[in-house]
Structures are given as structure tokens and as C-alpha cells.
Design a protein with these regions (language model features):
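Conserved glycine-rich FAD pyrophosphate-binding loop
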Residues: 2-4, 39, 64, 69-71, ...
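Short amphipathic alpha-helix segments
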Residues: 9-13, 232-261, 344-362, 393-404
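N-terminal glycine-rich flavin-associated loop
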Residues: 14, 34-66, 84, 90-136, ...
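Short glycine-biased active-site loop of nucleotidyltransferases that positions the nucleotide triphosphate
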Residues: 33-36, 77-82, 266-268
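Short beta-strand-to-loop capping motifs
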Residues: 47, 226-230, 278-284, 340-344, ...
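Short, conserved charged micro-motifs
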Residues: 51-54, 116, 232-236, 284-292, ...
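C-terminal substrate-binding/cap subdomain adjacent to the FAD-binding core in PCMH-type
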Residues: 147, 166-331
Length: 459
């Protein structure tokens, strides 16, 4: 092996570790694993944590850059990779290790999809679930959800992966296998490595197995859809709802373009320029009472129409909302998707400001606001003249970023064409904790092999 070319040596060693069937080097197949136009030299699909450890250990010794990958649903997020030799796919890490519904815990490998987990849990007894609802729920893997700390509308009631995870098994950049936490919900001794890895985008370690808290399935779920003519009216209703004793699981505000693009899968009010969708979970009597009270509350703000969705229609609406971004990219080329975070009380104000900025530049945007969380997704539909308008899109991003910062928040470009990524920092303005993040990366990954260039500040 000493006399082999480096590329042949890499392939040979990976085959030794995981077996020939789990090493992909066909140029045509590698295209599917490209990130921002960069194609890996090889894709490897280890089947155990030990195999992941051996692959990473070898890559570290040979200074080979690794990009971890689950289903690829979030692969467009982040900066352009500085280097990408190996894509390490977790697709073969797809087993449930322990399902203990009596103690409300689940241990599963990182390549398992959330959809598969939820389907299995729903069949146990009266049903259980992992209270996470990130985008791309049908494809998103547990590892990808945790690595990006991805969340959805139900974050309002249940929190994020950071609140649900109680244990991890991961491989650090030197190949060491690290175990932190466990099945005990209140495990607080020592440093919390779980929290360190959540939202690190695969730059500090590769998640292999995780333990989560579970909850029993609610007796009923429903959605109340309310249409409004003006953003001020929709926001006024949402403000009162947030301050009330009612307990929705999610509150969404959609502008007219977002409603239009979702109409294929919706049974929602067609009238009005804005839609407020309120998710509810619990016992039947509680949901019926809350729907009645919310409907009366909305009348004070001039609601045009109200619709209640149950069962399949309820599920179809939220699936369509979570998959909104992927539907747009399937339908249009060069879509730009941005995620803003700010104070919850500023949701309506920021949405209104974003609309004025986009209208001033003649740009069409679909907006979906998680109004219960202080999160706003802005999806830019570039149209036919994308190349000639790149500077306008850059100006839009810069102005929206400034508006988010003004409201004590931030903006991240979650997906965009490479031409946009080359002109803006997709992570937005520098954070005050950047030096801490940089030092952590240097300490844990001194060889610089994991997801290089894709995280905050080009880490």
C-alpha cells in the first residue's frame, strides 16, 4: 500500500474498514453527494460506531477532510466547503437501540429518519412520539436534526432537540468515541457534551447514537385557520393569543404568496392577504373550547373567515408547511431561503419591514413566521432574470440582516445559489462568541478535517 497513489490508498483503506459494498467512487454516483458544486473523492457508509471511529481516525492521520451527511435534506445549509475528500454517510446507522416507553426514553442511531421513529412509536400502546417537527420531516435524520438543532412550529410548546436530548454517542475528529448522558432524564454531572454537539453542524464530531425524551401522543390534534386583510390585524390577534391563558402548540403567520404556493395541499380560508394557523393538541374538550375562544378573539381583529382542520387535513397542512422550502426548490431554480430570529414581540413588525424592503427592490417573497417562536422564514422567488439581478438579491439579504439585528436578532441564509454564497456571509453578522467557537474548534479538531468552511466564520 505504501507505493500506491494517495487516492488509491484512501479507497483501499476505506474498503478495509467498511467493506467494498459501502464505498462509493463511481463519478456519476458521486455527483449526488456534491456540495455547492464540489464533489467528494469518495463516499463511505459505515454501519457501526466503531467503523465511523476507524474512518475518522484514518482521515485525521492522512489530513483528509470529511463532510458528514444524513439524508442530505440540510446539505445546502452553511458556507461553501473549503475541502471535501470524504462524504461520510450515516445511512447505515439506522437502528433503534432501545425503546423504553415506560420510562419515556428512546435510543436510536443517527441515520434513522424522524418519520420512521414516529411511525414506530405511534404503534406502541396508546402511542408515543418524539416532540420534534423540523422541516423535511419525512427525510430528516435524527443526526441531521440534532447537528443543525433544526426545529419547527411546535418549538413553541415543546422546545428543540436541545430540550429533548439526554444522551449521545459521537466520534470526535481524532477518532475517539465519546459517550455523554444516558437514559436518566436529570443527568447533570460533569460537562454536558450533548449540548456542545447540538447545532455544531458536524464541525466538532459525528453523531452516531442519541437518547431522547418521549411523550404520550395527545388524544386529539387540530388546526384553526384564520384569514385577515391586514398584517396589523393578524399580528394583533397573535399578540393577544400569546398573552392569553390558551395553550397552542404552534402559531404561524403566512403572507398571501406563501398561502398561494401551499394551496395545493390546504383546506384553509382562501380570502385575505394573511393566514394565521394555530396548532392545538390535547383532550377533545380542551381543543373544542380553545377553538371557540380563539375564534371569538379573532373577531375583534376583523377576521374574514375561520376554518378548523381535523385528522388528515390537519396533518396534511403541517406536512406541507414543513416541506414548503423543498417544494419551492423543486418548482423553481435559484430559490433563496433565509431564516431570521428575533424577539417574539417583534414578529409582525419585522415581517412588515421585510415586505417593504422586498417590495422596494421589486422582489417576490413568500413569508412563513413561527410567530410563537420569534422565527421568520423568507423565501425569495427570483424569477427568470436571476443572473442580472444578483446585486439586488444581495442588497435584499443585507437590508433584511440589518433589520433583524436592529430587533435584537440575526439572519441566516439557509439555501441559495453558489453565486449568492460567494457574495454574502450566509451566517450573517459576526457573533460576540465567535472567538469561543473558534477556540473550541481548534481544540477539538486541530487537524481541521470536519466540515471545514461550512460553519460560522468559515470554521
Amino acid at each position: 500500500m505504501k507505493d500506491m497513489p494517495k487516492s488509491d490508498k484512501l479507497i483501499a483503506r476505506l474498503r478495509e474498514i467498511v467493506g467494498e459494498a459501502h464505498v462509493i467512487q463511481d463519478p456519476d454516483k458521486l455527483k449526488a453527494y456534491a456540495v455547492d458544486g464540489k464533489k467528494p473523492k469518495v463516499v463511505v457508509t459505515p454501519g457501526t460506531t466503531d467503523e465511523v471511529s476507524r474512518v475518522v481516525d484514518y482521515a485525521s492521520q492522512e489530513h483528509r477532510a470529511i463532510v458528514p451527511r444524513g439524508s442530505g435534506s440540510k446539505i445546502k445549509m452553511g458556507g461553501i466547503p473549503k475541502k471535501m475528500d470524504i462524504v461520510l454517510s450515516t445511512s447505515q446507522l439506522n437502528r433503534i437501540r432501545d425503546r423504553d416507553c415506560e420510562n419515556l426514553t428512546l435510543s436510536a442511531e443517527s441515520g434513522l429518519t424522524l418519520c420512521e421513529v414516529q411511525q414506530g412509536l405511534a404503534k406502541v400502546g396508546k402511542g408515543y412520539f418524539l416532540p420534534l417537527d423540523p422541516p423535511f420531516t419525512d427525510k430528516a435524520t435524527l443526526g441531521g436534526i440534532v447537528a443543525t438543532n433544526s426545529s419547527g412550529p411546535k418549538r413553541m410548546l415543546y422546545g428543540t432537540a436541545r430540550d429533548m436530548i439526554i444522551g449521545v454517542k459521537a466520534v470526535f475528529p481524532n477518532g475517539d468515541i465519546v459517550v455523554s448522558g444516558g437514559k436518566t432524564v436529570k443527568n447533570v454531572s460533569g460537562y454536558d457534551m450533548c449540548k456542545l454537539l447540538i447545532g455544531s453542524y458536524g464541525t466538532l464530531g459525528i453523531l452516531c447514537e442519541m437518547t431522547f425524551k418521549l411523550l404520550p401522543l395527545p388524544e386529539k390534534e387540530a388546526t384553526l385557520g384564520l384569514s385577515f386583510a391586514r398584517l396589523e390585524d393578524a399580528d394583533g390577534f397573535v399578540r393577544e393569543l400569546r398573552g392569553s391563558q390558551l395553550i397552542p402548540s404552534s402559531i404561524e403567520i403566512l403572507n398571501g404568496l406563501a398561502v398561494q404556493k401551499m394551496s395545493h395541499s390546504m383546506s384553509m380560508p382562501p380570502n385575505g392577504n394573511y393566514l394565521v394557523a394555530v396548532g392545538l393538541e390535547g383532550v377533545v374538550e380542551s381543543i373544542d373550547r380553545q377553538v371557540s375562544e380563539m375564534s371569538e378573539m379573532a373577531k375583534k381583529y376583523g377576521t374574514l373567515e375561520a376554518v378548523t382542520l381535523d385528522a388528515e387535513k390537519h396533518q396534511a397542512f403541517w406536512v406541507a408547511l414543513r416541506n414548503f422550502s423543498s417544494r419551492l426548490t423543486d418548482e423553481y431554480s435559484n430559490v433563496i431561503s433565509m431564516k431570521s430570529n428575533f424577539l417574539i414581540s417583534k414578529c409582525g413588525e419585522v415581517l412588515g419591514s421585510y415586505e417593504k424592503i422586498a417590495q422596494g427592490l421589486g422582489i417576490n417573497c413568500a413569508y412563513i413566521s413561527h410567530a410563537g417562536n420569534g422565527i421568520l422564514y423568507s423565501h425569495v422567488l427570483p424569477g427568470k432574470n436571476f443572473r442580472s439581478r444578483i446585486e439586488s438579491f444581495v442588497e435584499l439579504i443585507e437590508k433584511m440582516t440589518a433589520e433583524a439585528v436592529k430587533n435584537e436578532g440575526s439572519l441566516v441564509v439557509e439555501s441559495s445559489p453558489i453565486s449568492i454564497k460567494k457574495k454574502v456571509d450566509v451566517w450573517g453578522q459576526s457573533r460576540s462568541d465567535y472567538l469561543v467557537v473558534r477556540r473550541l474548534k481548534d481544540q477539538i479538531d486541530p487537524a481541521g478535517i470536519l466540515n471545514i468552511g461550512r460553519f460560522v466564520g468559515g470554521i
